């Protein structure tokens, strides 16, 4: 999906909030603050006029209109109406926010509900065709690199392990220097799968730029559709995640990224399911060999 296609693909219902969060990336601090206020449950319950919103946020009415248009709406009323529909349709799956003094049972229930909400919102805007196009190129590629930093690198290691089970070899690199060395050797017909929540990590961006320059295709899993790394990508798989107290945004992002990559993995496996099953039996037998009691 191109940047222009994303900008025009305004979703309805539960998919609206994650779409707006992704559009929020790259906005100024004041613009972003307006989006956060609008997305907070309860703030639009009394159908406030644009004047009321401007006063509540200490900004001009013109700024509210500007943000509405940046989000893809003709004006504030149109945006407010869409958000009212969103909150009406999603009230059953929107958990109340975590508090610092909650009872243990409430904490556990809310964490589960936040995860469920993240998965449902991600599913509502997922581009299935983009996943299948990316999966086909990944499967056919000569060399497959996996790039990510911090927690995203741990996800890349999981992806490498998952694909090795079905005989699709790919390599995750834990060090930025090794990542760059590998990128320098890539060529046309190769692919990089990059996992980056922000889409702005400098080390990862440098490796992706080099891989792109050398002719490799880029598949990007990211929350930020308009980020520098996403703009380098040939295939973008959106991973929107809400930010919550205590958990932040990374916890929700990790769960959704793993789910999207599971879908990506199955899409790749389906391209040659017979061979995938044969290879799973082989690799599974080796793992079983090292299980307790197997060496007796």
Swiss-Prot record:
Coiled coil location: none
Gene3D superfamilies attached to this UniProt entry: Glucose-6-phosphate isomerase like protein, domain 1, Winged helix-like DNA-binding domain superfamily/Winged helix DNA-binding domain
Segments forming domain HTH rpiR-type: 14-90
GO molecular function, one term: DNA binding
Domain SIS: 134-274
Key words, A-Z: DNA-binding, Repressor, Transcription, Transcription regulation
The keyword Nucleotide-binding is annotated on this UniProt entry: no
InterPro entries referenced in this protein's UniProt entry, alphabetically: Homeodomain-like_sf, HTH_RpiR, RpiR-like, RpiR-like_SIS, SIS_dom, SIS_dom_sf, WH-like_DNA-bd_sf
UniProt record, GO biological process: carbohydrate derivative metabolic process; negative regulation of DNA-templated transcription; regulation of DNA-templated transcription
Transcription among keywords: yes
Role this protein plays: Regulatory protein involved in rpiB gene repression. Also involved in als operon repression.
Name of the protein: HTH-type transcriptional regulator RpiR
């Amino acid at each position: 999906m191109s940047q222009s296609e994303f900008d025009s693909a305004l979703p309805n219902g539960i998919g609206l909030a994650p779409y707006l969060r992704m559009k929020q990336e790259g906005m100024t601090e004041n613009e972003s603050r307006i989006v956060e206020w609008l997305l907070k449950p309860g703030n639009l319950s009394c159908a406030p006029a644009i004047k009321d919103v401007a006063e509540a946020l200490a900004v001009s009415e013109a700024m509210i209109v500007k943000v509405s248009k940046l989000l893809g709406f003709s004006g504030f009323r149109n945006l407010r109406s869409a958000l009212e529909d969103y909150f009406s349709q999603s009230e059953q799956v929107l958990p109340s926010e975590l508090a610092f003094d909650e009872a243990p049972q409430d904490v556990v229930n809310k964490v589960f509900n936040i995860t469920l909400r993240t998965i449902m919102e991600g599913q509502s805007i997922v581009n299935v065709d983009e996943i299948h196009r990316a999966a086909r190129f990944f499967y056919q590629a000569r060399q497959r690199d996996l790039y990510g930093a911090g927690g995203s690198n741990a996800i890349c290691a999981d992806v490498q392990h998952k694909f090795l089970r079905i005989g699709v070899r790919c390599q995750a690199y834990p060090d930025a220097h090794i990542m760059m060395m590998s990128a320098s050797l890539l060529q046309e017909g190769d692919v990089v799968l990059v996992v980056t929540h922000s889409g702005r990590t400098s080390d990862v961006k440098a490796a992706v730029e080099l891989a792109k320059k050398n002719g490799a295709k880029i598949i990007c899993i990211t929350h930020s559709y308009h980020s520098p790394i996403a703009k380098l990508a040939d295939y973008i798989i959106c991973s929107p995640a809400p930010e919550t107290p205590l958990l932040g945004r990374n916890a929700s992002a990790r769960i959704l990224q793993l789910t999207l990559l599971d879908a990506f993995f199955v899409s790749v496996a389906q391209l040659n399911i017979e061979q995938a099953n044969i290879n799973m039996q082989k690799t599974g037998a080796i793992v079983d060999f090292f299980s307790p009691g197997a060496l007796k």
